[in-house]
Curated annotation (Swiss-Prot):
Protein name in UniProt: D-tagatose-1,6-bisphosphate aldolase subunit KbaZ
Pathway: Carbohydrate metabolism; D-tagatose 6-phosphate degradation; D-glyceraldehyde 3-phosphate and glycerone phosphate from D-tagatose 6-phosphate: step 2/2
GO CC, alphabetical: plasma membrane
Highest taxon above the source species: Bacteria
Function comment: Component of the tagatose-1,6-bisphosphate aldolase KbaYZ that is required for full activity and stability of the Y subunit. Could have a chaperone-like function for the proper and stable folding of KbaY. When expressed alone, KbaZ does not show any aldolase activity.
Length: 426
């Protein structure tokens, strides 16, 4: 499993290549990603976050072993080779247990790391940047690094115990914004300074040495930094290369290290490519993929309303709205303003809090109903042109079947294609 270290080696040799990480647990998003990687004969990096998946089930109800089983089963069903599949764990540390005293939170984090590594996750992002109940705010670099080194030691021991070799690849550091998009309206964003990046690296190097982990330094392949990209509910802060020049140049002096950029969703294709060229060569994408899924489903729901009597319609959008209103915990603290502003945000926000609701049984039933209604007879081409114009072009040229499922998958793949192109290199 050396896809990532090989990618870094090639990047350092001047290939200007990279890899994107699919950060989603939605079956249609994962199917779209697996099929896209298969068609393009590339490895596929799929990541779970510590919020989604943990030893207690996370918000998806899946443990790391469950998630691996789910992804591998899907890959097998699509004839995707498992040796081309890389599983990563994102923001692994005490993130989920910040309300507990540090000793307790870190004990949970130890078990979190064990569960991810034992399940076969090979890319491990160690993130201990968050303060626990009895911690100072913010934590010093040294405390963050000491905790990360402790987790790295647990990871190495677990990997040796389960697989007979230690072949994990690590990412350290964190971006400044919260994972999953900013809560508030943004206008500008501070880029990580070269000094801050160096301080993080040196603190980690020192902490790893104290744990006797000098030998794993070449397997620390990336540092998470903020290159100046983010999104909120209706705006995107685009990458401005000039503001990140000093940061980009700083990593060139580290032989085995690149940067990892989070919250790259909704960047333009040109910005994605420039990020990779500037050594932000691991691009994380999640909400933009479920946003594309949501776009396709809303389009199909509009087509359904044109074709099917109201009584027989799935009512997907209304079901979704009702469930979100009845269970507001995933959006209430994120979306603000009057009733209309919040209604618009629930449906259309870039932060895509709706992604937390797709597994709901009522919504899933409405989705299945929608697909059934539109699968019974061919969708008229003018309606595909009206509501899914990019897919219409491919349907007309004969490269895409106009079935509900294929239209959804292809719409998601349009986003994946931008990331693939950005990461291809020369």
């Amino acid at each position: 499993m050396k896809h990532l270290t090989e990618m870094v080696r090639q990047h350092k040799a001047g290939k200007t290549n990279g890899i994107y990480a699919v950060c989603s647990a939605h079956p249609l998003v994962l199917e779209a990603a697996i099929r896209y990687a298969s068609a393009n004969q590339t490895p596929l990096l799929i990541e779970a976050t510590s919020n989604q998946v943990d030893q207690f089930g996370g918000y998806t109800g899946m443990t790391p072993a469950d998630f691996r089983g789910f992804v591998c089963q899907l890959a097998d069903s699509l004839n995707f080779p498992q040796d081309a599949l890389i599983l990563g764990g994102d923001h692994l540390g005490p993130n989920r247990w910040q309300n507990l005293p540090a000793a307790q939170a870190m004990a949970n984090a130890d078990d979190l790391i064990k569960s991810y590594v034992a399940a076969g996750f090979k890319k491990i992002h160690l993130d201990c940047s968050m303060s626990c109940q009895d911690d100072p705010i913010p934590l010093t670099d040294d405390i963050v690094a000491e905790r990360a080194a402790r987790l790295a030691k647990v990871a190495e021991e677990t990997c040796l115990e389960h697989f007979g070799e230690a072949d994990l690849e690590y990412v350290i550091g964190t971006e400044v914004p919260v994972p999953g998009g900013a809560h508030e309206t943004l206008s500008e964003l501070a880029v990580t300074t070269p000094d801050a990046a160096r301080a993080t690296l040196e603190a980690h190097r020192h902490a790893f040495e104290k744990q006797g982990l000098n030998a794993i330094w070449p397997r620390i392949i990336a540092l998470v930094v903020q290159p100046g990209v983010e999104f909120d509910h209706t705006n995107v802060i685009d990458y401005q290369p000039a503001k990140a020049t000093a940061l980009s140049q700083m990593v060139e002096s580290y032989e085995t290290l690149i940067f990892e950029a989070h919250s790259t969703d909704y960047q333009t294709p040109q910005s994605l490519r420039q990020l990779v060229i500037d050594h932000f060569a691991i691009l994380k994408v999640g909400p933009a993929l479920t946003f594309a899924l949501r776009e396709a489903l809303f389009s199909l729901a509009a087509i359904e309303e044109e074709l099917v009597p109201a009584k027989a319609c799935s009512g997907l959008r209304q079901v979704l709205e009702n469930v979100m209103l009845n269970r507001p915990e995933y959006w209430q603290s994120h979306y603000h303003g009057d009733g209309n502003a919040r209604r618009l945000a629930r449906g259309y926000s870039y932060s895509d809090r709706v992604r937390y609701y797709w597994p709901d049984s009522q919504i899933d039933d409405a989705f299945a109903h929608l697909v059934r209604n539109l699968a019974d007879s061919p969708i008229p081409l003018p309606l595909i042109s009206q509501y899914l114009p990019l897919q219409y072009v491919k349907v007309r040229s004969g490269e895409l079947q106009p079935t509900p499922r294929e239209l959804i998958i292809n719409h998601i793949q349009d986003i994946l294609a931008q990331y693939h192109t950005a990461c291809e290199g020369q």
